[in-house]
Amino acid sequence: MSDTMKGTGSCLCGAIRIIANNLSNKVGACHCGMCRKWGGGPLMAVNCGTDVSFEGEGNISVFNSSDWAERGFCNKCGSHLFYRLKERKQYIIPMGLFDDQETFVFNDQLFIDKKPSFYSFANKTNDMTEAEVLDKYAGN
């Protein structure tokens, strides 16, 4: 099975359709404070690379959340649409937005050292600390 595929999805109200041509099947959970504050818990998302398009782009608002990334949301229903690395133009999109989720595999946990102690996932995953994540992504 390929690690990437084409995926389609939408926001909660349907005002925005997502087309990701290189959607990874590997789901990652981010436990950083920003993601938990943004969504009320860990962000469960997939890397979609740069080949992503949206129908209904006029309904997308973007929040500049750090020096290296921004977050998009539907300005009609509030659905979280993406976390985008600015320089790479790389999209990380919440997996729950996609129509077909059966091929996803839970693979990574980011900012594992920031995860609150009141929850944990049973899946065996590749875990990265805050320092490891920042070293890999913040400078790019």
Task: Describe the residue ranges of each PLM region.
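A short Gly-Trp-Pro
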Residues: 1-140
